[in-house]
């Protein structure tokens, strides 16, 4: 029996075949198991010798099973590794290259320019209260910007900020002049969506406050931004305009030599000298917090512009809605230009 069992074990080519041999000989109803079960029928004087003989056979079969199982498992592992082998000399799969979204790239360009001029870059809450968004910025209750049709109002009386200017108020309340900041973030307007308008868009806004700050300082700052964004040949044009939180106010445009042709004036944003009423509102808020009134008598300028407009003009994007379509076929076109 021992020789027959070992022969069948060595002939097994798979683990399933080996298991069948194991069941045949040492399973619950196997040949060796039955021999052990029949020992009780033997006379006592034969039982011990026969039991030792059967145990020797059992041990030999178990040893052969263990050895053959190891051989078959190693063979199976080798076969699997061979089938899954990777030729490391083959070229790898190309990884899709990412790139900055056009708006993010314009943001990075703008904030980089102002950081080099010593500005701190800050952000603020997108949900604002009416006072910080309007009243403190010299926008009284009867101003058209307070119309319910132009603003996203929340049930608790708060609103989605319509510009990044409220952060100027918050920053001045918490900090003393002199100061130089740019505020970046999303703003919201309740208006119809078309190729040039979205209900949500981005702004970058700057504020400088100190002693003796003049319109000449503002013009120099805008000119430096234009040169940093469009090159050393960029020229800046200012035209009078009205904004309730600055006086005097102006719109500014940049002459851009477009490498695609069609060089033209690009209207980028608005600016002006901070209105005295804004400083007065800041001091009122500071006084309510037990802080000294320090802004009345100071001078400063503010400016604001939209990254979407800059990106649309610079990269020839015809529809603002493309920025938010999340279509990689659209955004991927600008990967090379945007770095």
Swiss-Prot record:
BP GO annotations: phenylalanyl-tRNA aminoacylation
Enzyme Commission number, as recorded: 6.1.1.20
Keyword terms of this UniProt record: Aminoacyl-tRNA synthetase, ATP-binding, Cytoplasm, Ligase, Magnesium, Metal-binding, Nucleotide-binding, Protein biosynthesis
Gene3D superfamilies assigned: Bira Bifunctional Protein, Domain 2 (3.30.930.10)
Listed InterPro entries: aa-tRNA-synth_II (IPR006195), aa-tRNA-synth_II/BPL/LPL (IPR045864), Phe-tRNA-synth_IIc_asu (IPR004529), Phe-tRNA_ligase_II_N (IPR004188), Phe_tRNA_ligase_alpha1_bac (IPR022911), Phenylalanyl-tRNA_Synthase (IPR002319), tRNA-bd_arm (IPR010978)
SUPFAM superfamilies according to UniProt: Class II aaRS and biotin synthetases (SSF55681), tRNA-binding arm (SSF46589)
Cofactor note as given: Binds 2 magnesium ions per tetramer.
Record-listed Mg(2+) binding positions: 247
GO MF terms held by the record: ATP binding; magnesium ion binding; phenylalanine-tRNA ligase activity; tRNA binding
Family matches, as CDD domains: PheRS_alpha_core
Keyword match Cytoplasm: yes
Cofactor(s) it depends on: Mg(2+)
Quaternary context: Tetramer of two alpha and two beta subunits.
Similarity section: Belongs to the class-II aminoacyl-tRNA synthetase family. Phe-tRNA synthetase alpha subunit type 1 subfamily.
Name used for this protein in its record: Phenylalanine--tRNA ligase alpha subunit
Origin species: Deinococcus deserti (strain DSM 17065 / CIP 109153 / LMG 22923 / VCD115)
Classification of source organism: Bacteria, Thermotogati, Deinococcota, Deinococci, Deinococcales
Gene behind the chain: pheS
